[in-house]
Amino acid sequence: MTKIWFITGSSRGLGLAIAEAALNNGDSVIATARKPEQLTNLVNKFGKERVFPVALDVTDNNQVLQAVKSGHEKFGRIDVVINNAGYANTAAVEDIDVDDFCAQVEANLMGVVYVSKAVLPILRQQKSGHIFQVSSLGGRIGAPGLSAYQSAKWAVGGFSTVLAQEVASFGIKITVLEPGGIRTDWAGSSMQVPTVSEPYQATVGAFAESLRKSSGSEVSIPSKIANIVLKVLGEKEPPLRLLVGPDAVEYAGKAAEVLSASDEKWRELSLASA
């Protein structure tokens, strides 16, 4: 049976690649973007019968509710949800504007919460559905300058772990995708890097520069990640959390080893509370 996909951030990058993979697979897509005119090529290529473009800013809960409602009315069901929209700016904690910090959390975390909440009644009534949260390797590690973005991604992992337990009995599956570098514009023009203050040049400044230099040569290709999503979708028991990319596997493994070693080092003190 063909599936109906609801995808946020469908106009470019990973969201567009997943939308195209779903459509090439014979499915239909509720394609959302802040600027729906950017979805014109997708509609022209696959037809308005299978591509339903919807304006959506995921930080606006009322807009989320309306987008889900209109998409559901168009196709009669929603089978797959891809929470993909998000962005990162780079700044030291001491330097970052509080409004910028909150805006990143709103887009990267609350957008996931809003969309997940909006689709749950539909999926629960259907007794089926699969929600994919596009998180990041940054949901398992920390990098200087990405405090807002990575705080949100860590929270997406926690939120989704709880959500999976709440909805499993309804036939709803949850998968958190945790990619490393993806060959998109994430670290290019999409990312703002305010002036880094002198004390943080060696940490935040150096890391921001490394992101800029690597932009366009990241390991993972959006279309290949889209194929991974299709494969996971076909699994009877899909993973709750899935690292994506050789860099993600490497760095997450190293981070887990460091944490395990620290836990073991301080084990005796940890047990002293009883």
Curated annotation (Swiss-Prot):
The keyword NADP applies. Pfam families: adh_short. InterPro entries: NAD(P)-bd_dom_sf, SDR_fam, SDR_oxidoreductase. Pathway: Polyketide biosynthesis. NADP(+) binds at L14, T32, D57, N84, K117, Y149, K153, I182, T184. It is an enzyme of class 1 (oxidoreductase). The active site is at S135 (proton donor), Y149 (proton donor), K153 (lowers pka of active site tyr). Induction: Expression of the botcinic acid clusters genes BOA1-13 and BOA17 is coregulated by BCG1 during both in vitro and in planta growth. Its EC number is 1.-.-.-. Belongs to the short-chain dehydrogenases/reductases (SDR) family. Oxidoreductase; part of the gene cluster B that mediates the biosynthesis of botcinic acid and its botcinin derivatives, acetate-derived polyketides that contribute to virulence when combined with the sesquiterpene botrydial. Botcinic acid and its derivatives have been shown to induce chlorosis and necrosis during host plant infection, but also have antifungal activities. Two polyketide synthases, BOA6 and BOA9, are involved in the biosynthesis of botcinins. This is Oxidoreductase BOA17. It comes from Botryotinia fuckeliana (strain B05.10) (Noble rot fungus). The lineage of its organism: Eukaryota, Fungi, Dikarya, Ascomycota, Pezizomycotina.
